[in-house]
Amino acid sequence: MSKSTAEIRQAFLDFFHSKGHQVVASSSLVPHNDPTLLFTNAGMNQFKDVFLGLDKRNYSRATTSQRCVRAGGKHNDLENVGYTARHHTFFEMLGNFSFGDYFKHDAIQFAWELLTSEKWFALPKERLWVTVYESDDEAYEIWEKEVGIPRERIIRIGDNKGAPYASDNFWQMGDTGPCGPCTEIFYDHGDHIWGGPPGSPEEDGDRYIEIWNIVFMQFNRQADGTMEPLPKPSVDTGMGLERIAAVLQHVNSNYDIDLFRTLIQAVAKVTGATDLSNKSLRVIADHIRSCAFLIADGVMPANENRGYVLRRIIRRAVRHGNMLGAKETFFYKLVGPLIDVMGSAGEDLKRQQAQVEQVLKTEEEQFARTLERGLALLDEELAKLSGDTLDGETAFRLYDTYGFPVDLTADVCRERNIKVDEAGFEAAMEEQRRRAREASGFGADYNAMIRVDSASEFKGYDHLELNGKVTALFVDGKAVDAINAGQEAVVVLDQTPFYAESGGQVGDKGELKGANFSFAVEDTQKYGQAIGHIGKLAAGSLKVGDAVQADVDEARRARIRLNHSATHLMHAALRQVLGTHVSQKGSLVNDKVLRFDFSHNEAMKPEEIRAVEDLVNTQIRRNLPIETNIMDLEAAKAKGAMALFGEKYDERVRVLSMGDFSTELCGGTHASRTGDIGLFRIISESGTAAGVRRIEAVTGEGAIATVHADSDRLSEVAHLLKGDSNNLADKVRSVLERTRQLEKELQQLKEQAAAQESANLSSKAIDVNGVKLLVSELSGVEPKMLRTMVDDLKNQLGSTIIVLATVVEGKVSLIAGVSKDVTDRVKAGELIGMVAQQVGGKGGGRPDMAQAGGTDAAALPAALASVKGWVSAKLQ
């Protein structure tokens, strides 16, 4: 009996655990502090800083089953999903990693044992082929002489992509940074399936399928292309869970494994589809995985960056549901079946199920309102099409008006063998191109990053003043031995009381000083295991090895501590008031304000905001002790400690508790007791994205200052209204009612004046070929009154053409009216367009009524004078 996908995942982790590897949980799909990535797309992403030497772990061997997304940016599989056997937007990457521990020999032997041992995957050895980089003789000999694979099944792959080291078998993190040769393992499905071995002309067939890639990181590529050997070579491997499941379950398509069969049946059930071979079922089954896990990891549908990619995937899935005949919202209903089929890998998703379902449902409802109209427009355009290419302007209009991503339009067109002019689409979408570049233009030169071999010891929990030693200096990212007065630099110490920005809390400010120098610290940041003090040398000189006294700005740190502790109280209060679906999506804690982003699908009601404020202030008055404990990450989670969004944690974590009210993982600085906070006030609540709200609040002296400011404003208003705070609301209501009455009377007077003006104007009309023509510029008339005047004049004059204009604050307003019996010869829209063009504007409207605006008031007299000639020509 073949193993289930869940059993295969667990077997992989168990095997490497038995080989001394630390089992590490999957990291977020949103890369932590990595500007080079749109989404986590490989198992090694969470270990990138370890491979770069910027981070150290308490283990040298690791194994993971990493959730990955490839849709957008460099790795974009979206358009192929559902149409091939192995493309996905979401997949799990099984991997084992060595950080300067074992290398080629053990990595190859581990892979062979797992794949072929009867105890593990028991694949037939004769079905396995391998590739190595052309010059990697070491790997070749291990496969041939130690593993025993015949030479004919070991294939050398050279530089097959047009440049040195540009090869399927040479892995590179980027243009610079760690890289090295790799060996890939392929499974031969048999000669009943078309395809040839890797490196052959038929290699794109489905007979030989890559199942495992083992990368040997042994070089550091410099900007000039030279390869420097790494002091500690490492190993990074990746095996797609879905691919190995297909092999072990004896099926040729990933969509035929147990996990996808279950999801496809769930999709069919919620959409009413009966043909289980329909490709739309595969598309939706894939897309629910990426969408659900992206939302669970904090990504929300939006019009830029990661949120835009998510929106594209959701809308593609909804469109395929529409094709299957779904009559109502369906996509969110697949979250439950997904959680069931993911097993232990779906635990994070299960905790946020309600929030994920709500976001998907809201997005689908919004798109459903325009989908039908958009598809109808596309059908119209395709019906008129004479060639085989849809123009880019139409594709852009679908995007701009109906929210159709161009790949969705391309999807529809592909089903009818029609191409989309994507170049034309891009040309018509300049602003969106800017957004797309922001979304996918992630890139960095790893060798330009500050690298510090030493670590800094943070002692700021207990000290605000400390003596330390300079271990490194950096100017413009480059290490230097000394700096002089006036230079900006990053100073690294062996130990420091300065807190480096992390977990939403800003870095400390302060001073590093000695007998002959003073360095003003404006910010503090982490660089791997080192803490960098960023600032400017105000006086003297400073060199590596110097002793310094590090003084944190104590008053600023105190305010930050209060705000950070209040953030924890507010998080717990929000979950009590709004529900346990609330989870942190981002935060900023500085010395002036605390800002907290959280998952919630609607604006908070005033009474909810008040309830949160009251609950937090109640905990402040309780004067709860704020305590910290260091424990294992899993033990902390079992205790119910909440983790911060987007934060990366070590195996040992700091757990912060505030009595029985709040327990969170946090490395920040905090008050000693909740009573130290003094007072908490919410100053704003707003939305930042679909399903994400933001609260800004103040504490302590800052909160008291807002109370005083509110009181001062109230007193000022009371003084202006000649009342006091006790009857202020009644006074305001009285003033508003009086204002409304006066505005009504004023409007009546304006209408009377306009009617009188219309009566006066009618006598100025002239006859042009039997039609009354009236053209006039009016002074002191509001633009919105022009329409009423035109209606009155049309009633008075009969067969008529009218053009009225007024100038307010330098802006021209125009209106044209044409009686219906004349519209076959003169159209108001054409007439107003002719006049508007002369005053720097444009406009339009119906044949009988049109409006326009302009910016060139000086040109108005000449423009109005041109009307008679234009009308005369039309009426001949």
UniProtKB/Swiss-Prot annotation:
Role according to the record: Catalyzes the attachment of alanine to tRNA(Ala) in a two-step reaction: alanine is first activated by ATP to form Ala-AMP and then transferred to the acceptor end of tRNA(Ala). Also edits incorrectly charged Ser-tRNA(Ala) and Gly-tRNA(Ala) via its editing domain.
Named cofactor requirement(s): Zn(2+)
Binding residue positions for Zn(2+): H564, H568, C666, H670
Keywords: Acetylation, Aminoacyl-tRNA synthetase, ATP-binding, Cytoplasm, Ligase, Metal-binding, Nucleotide-binding, Protein biosynthesis, RNA-binding, tRNA-binding, Zinc
Ribosomal protein keyword on record: no
Record text on cofactor binding: Binds 1 zinc ion per subunit.
Main localization, broad class: cytoplasm
Annotated EC: 6.1.1.7
Domain-level remarks: Consists of three domains; the N-terminal catalytic domain, the editing domain and the C-terminal C-Ala domain. The editing domain removes incorrectly charged amino acids, while the C-Ala domain, along with tRNA(Ala), serves as a bridge to cooperatively bring together the editing and aminoacylation centers thus stimulating deacylation of misacylated tRNAs.
Catalytic activity: tRNA(Ala) + L-alanine + ATP = L-alanyl-tRNA(Ala) + AMP + diphosphate
InterPro entries membership: aa-tRNA-synth_II/BPL/LPL, Ala-tRNA-lgiase_IIc, Ala-tRNA-ligase_IIc_anticod-bd, Ala-tRNA-synth_IIc_core, Ala-tRNA-synth_IIc_N, Ala-tRNA_ligase, Ala_tRNA_ligase_euk/bac, DHHA1_dom
Protein name: Alanine--tRNA ligase
Gene name of the encoded protein: alaS
PROSITE patterns for the chain: AA_TRNA_LIGASE_II_ALA
Modified residues (N6-acetyllysine): K74
UniProt subcellular location: Cytoplasm
One term of GO molecular function: zinc ion binding
Family indicated by similarity: Belongs to the class-II aminoacyl-tRNA synthetase family.
Entry-linked SMART domains: tRNA_SAD
Single GO cellular component term: cytosol
HAMAP family: Ala_tRNA_synth_B
Assembly notes: Homotetramer.
NCBIfam families recorded: alaS
Pfam families in UniProt: DHHA1, tRNA-synt_2c, tRNA_SAD
Swiss-Prot/TrEMBL GO biological process terms: alanyl-tRNA aminoacylation; negative regulation of DNA-templated transcription
CDD domains: AlaRS_core (cd00673)
